[in-house]
Structure formats: structure tokens, C-alpha cells
UniProtKB/Swiss-Prot annotation:
Name of the molecule in the record: Early growth response protein 1
InterPro entries in alphabetical order: Znf_C2H2_sf, Znf_C2H2_type
One CC-aspect GO term: nucleus
Source species: Serinus canaria
SUPFAM superfamilies noted in UniProt: beta-beta-alpha zinc fingers
Family per record: Belongs to the EGR C2H2-type zinc-finger protein family.
Gene this protein is translated from: EGR1
Broad class of the protein's primary localization: nucleus
Cellular localisation: Nucleus; Cytoplasm
Pfam families associated with the record: zf-C2H2
Origin organism lineage: Eukaryota, Metazoa, Chordata, Craniata, Vertebrata
Entries under PROSITE patterns matching the protein: ZINC_FINGER_C2H2_1 (PS00028), ZINC_FINGER_C2H2_2 (PS50157)
């Protein structure tokens, strides 16, 4: 494709779209992800962790 990037890590992440590569695997359910931050967010579905709270109401 014609996409260009200023950083090599952005290119690496983009290439995964074309190749379908998903190198990050959840150890609990074995689901695979192309990005580590997506895996981190997914793991919270297993742990129930909710690290962000509203400053106004505390929920």
C-alpha cells in the first residue's frame, strides 16, 4: 500500500494489518492480538480490573 511512516514501530504495527500477524496471546483464553495494548485491555475482562475512576462521582 502507499502508507508511509516517520517511525519504524508504526510501520511494524501497520504491516501486521496486511500479514494478519497477532504475536500477543492471552494466557488465559489463548486469544491473539496484533498490539500489546489491546492484550492489556483484554486481560482486564478476565481480572475484573477497572483502573480508571471518575473524579467527580468516584465510579
Amino acid at each position: 500500500c502507499d502508507r508511509r511512516f516517520s517511525r519504524s514501530d508504526e510501520l511494524t504495527r501497520h504491516i501486521r494489518i496486511h500479514t494478519g500477524q497477532k504475536p500477543f496471546q492471552c494466557r488465559i483464553c489463548m486469544r491473539n492480538f496484533s498490539r500489546s495494548d489491546h492484550l492489556t485491555t483484554h486481560i482486564r475482562t478476565h481480572t475484573g480490573e477497572k483502573p480508571f475512576a471518575c473524579d467527580i462521582c468516584g465510579r
